[in-house]
């Protein structure tokens, strides 16, 4: 009898680096009840003043406490007790030193430069586990611990860092092998396998379909007496976006995709109901990206690799809600999978809302009752103004808890990037594909998939995101939530067909007749130049930018005069706290001294003077003068949006 008890005890799963590395890439595991069970928790720098102001926004430089170690002042970012594992770390501004103390030890097992750790430059955690994504610094790598983990930060006193530490909290008694940096070599095979597995592989299997009439359906049905799963769902739609057509044209790809509705039922239970493009994280037309569970190919093929189990039968169908027929093809592959009491069904639900951003409010992505695992979201934003739309924090509450297990620091922070950066990126667990926008104005698509950082729940999960926009404006947020749950789970409300339209967010057009500074040829005798973008208020959304010129340095360009005559020459120039004083000379006429320093960033149309100019090119020179005494750190920048000639 004793030997039997020992055998049963030994059979309990042990958590270590290898086991969690497998979870990073094996999507089938998400469709099963976690064994051992765990709760997911996020430790962040969120504003602690939430009790007094629910939308407080001081989300940096907040820590649990300060401790002294060997004369150092270390700020505690996370302090997890009991068996667990850190699986995710993010920061918008990683500087200083980060330390990891395992199992109550007084000496850190890891002590390293935070920026290197989160950018793929630490040899222990190279890409694809550590990397930058549109200015967001990310690390996805398991660090398990048997008794606890404390993460601390030491850095400059004038820097307030943004951070998020994601940890699993296993049940007491769970057997966990604590992370040992020197022993990572033993896990090299598993590390290599995970690195390969993070690169998605799409089966080279054909799609089938045809022309689906208005109101028609393309469907596929599956049966299995042994239990089964769908594991490769792909769709291709014959539709493209044409800039020459109006945004509202019903034949535009983004409108066609919104009115194609993908639905899925497993054993008679409908669990998926999402507009087709949104389901694949590609609401605004065909927007290519590659992530582990979902990819959108450049040829328009959209692929989902989620595991979708069923006990007896499954049905997948696409309804054409367009007024015209649509040519589309589909692929859904099946394989045998035993359906056990711990097997979950795949779910996805969509909602959209256009609403004034004042007063601020919480937008609910999902509100689910039952047992399961929350595994991701997609967000599509139609923002009609240049102001930032995503200051809001995520609030994810599990099993009715009083305070959310996940409380974030900003919408883009949740999606793994930072500083409102609109630059497209694709990573295994998150993406921001290219969309028609200008900085933060226009259309944006974000996706994040919780694979190794999924959120298990026993009775309920609610995912809210603050709709925190810098402007008072009607902004559209459309969201798709993905989760797994036991059969019979209570779902979020059904989508409202009235909200299908993706609102147009027209982008500004260039100033008529402008000679764009970014398009002109420039020569400089010192400093650094670049074409700066991301400002919708600029004529071509870009400017010529000259940084760090020394006194006396000259930037020279030439503007084309269409015909000889008398012209007033204007320039749209940048003014800011770090912009400088310059002598501006048109042709051989006397120069004009100009000071571009002011507290706030702004572009102003300034007259350089009225001149008799010959046909052809006229030289314009900017000579750097002593910086304004009030300039930030004595800096002296120059920004040229465009020149404009007006006949006099």
Spans of features found by a protein language model:
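Detector for intrinsically disordered, low-structure N-terminal pre-sequences
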Residues: 4, 14-16, 614, 619
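Extracytoplasmic
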Residues: 393-394, 398, 407, 497-648
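Beta-strand-centric surfaces of beta-sandwich/beta-rich domains
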Residues: 12-508
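Sec-dependent N-terminal signal peptides of Gram-negative exported proteins
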Residues: 1-11
